[in-house]
């Protein structure tokens, strides 16, 4: 009985230690297909390698939040860091700018990464 309590206590302590680890997210913004003006496509924001899991991700068009955005379930890697994919349908053109804005405890202010149509 005492042994199982000690094991449970050690397990809880090791899990609480994970919360102390903080890793900033890597942010990648790209289109599903090569960009062609006037041709529908998908804009993706892949956020990976972050810890803890609490994160806010917004896709932006000309600096304004895009409302119709979908995302994958929160998943974790072998190293216990997390990753997510946010995406939306869009039609690229010469005038509109797209970006991904991420808020995470490791950033003092939200980080915005612009979509580069040439990537």
From Swiss-Prot:
It comes from the Eukaryota. Belongs to the beta-2-microglobulin family. Heterodimer of an alpha chain and a beta chain. Beta-2-microglobulin is the beta-chain of major histocompatibility complex class I molecules. It holds the Pfam family C1-set. Residues 25-114 form the Ig-like C1-type domain. One of its GO terms (biological process) is antigen processing and presentation of peptide antigen via MHC class I. This is Beta-2-microglobulin. It comes from Cebuella pygmaea (Pygmy marmoset). The keyword Cytoplasm does not apply. Residues 1-20 form the signal peptide. Component of the class I major histocompatibility complex (MHC). Involved in the presentation of peptide antigens to the immune system. It is found in: Secreted. Its main location: secreted. GO terms for cellular component: extracellular region; MHC class I protein complex. The keyword Cell membrane does not apply. Keywords: Disulfide bond, Immunity, Immunoglobulin domain, MHC I, Secreted, Signal. CDD domains: IgC1_beta2m (cd05770). Disulfide bonds join 45-100. InterPro entries: B2Microglobulin, Ig-like_dom, Ig-like_dom_sf, Ig-like_fold, Ig/MHC_CS, Ig_C1-set, MHC/Immunoglobulin.
């Amino acid at each position: 009985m005492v042994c199982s309590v000690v094991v449970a206590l050690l397990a809880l302590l090791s899990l609480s230690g994970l919360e102390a680890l903080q890793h900033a997210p890597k942010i990648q913004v790209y289109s599903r297909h090569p960009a062609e003006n006037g041709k529908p496509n998908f804009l993706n924001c892949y956020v990976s390698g972050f810890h803890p899991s609490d994160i806010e991700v917004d896709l932006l068009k000309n600096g304004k939040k895009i409302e119709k955005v979908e995302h994958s379930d929160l998943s974790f890697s072998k190293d216990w860091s997390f990753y997510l994919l946010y995406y939306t349908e869009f039609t690229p053109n010469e005038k509109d700018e797209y970006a991904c804005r991420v808020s995470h405890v490791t950033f003092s202010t939200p980080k915005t990464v612009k979509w580069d149509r040439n990537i």
